[in-house]
Amino acid sequence: MRVVPLEAFRDKIPFSVAIAAVERGFAALGRGEAELPDPMVLELPAQQAEVHVKGAHLAGGRHIALKVATGFYRNRARGLPSGDGMFLLLDADTGVPAVLLEEHGYLTDFRTAAAVAVTLKYLAPKDAREALLVGAGALEIGRAHV
């Protein structure tokens, strides 16, 4: 299994590529060509934390994608980020782990910003030139691109 650190891909994926990929994924899901089960949520009240595990597979795709995202809300007091995450890509034919992406929430935020852009493409008035995202937090990543 290849381990890919965040530094290897941070700021190297053009936002237009992310938007196109998200749009293709939504279209495949709409056509019934994607598996996207409900997330598993592990709540840890004693730690004021939660762990989310999500999975997806596109019909005919080379990989099964699994995402683990954590929220450990006491971490700020420890000088650590409250959220973290990684993606694990499994070979779709064998189930063998192929790639581990140490994304630390970066791809999650990037994908979410791309999803907002796709949503605006189809739902915003055609003459709209600006959009206001209230409470968008880390989604600011796509601010200049939407």
Which stretches of residues belong to each language-model region?
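N-terminal ligand-binding/catalytic initiation module
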Residues: 1-108, 115-117, 124-127
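Alpha-helix N-cap/loop-to-helix initiation residues
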Residues: 108-109, 140
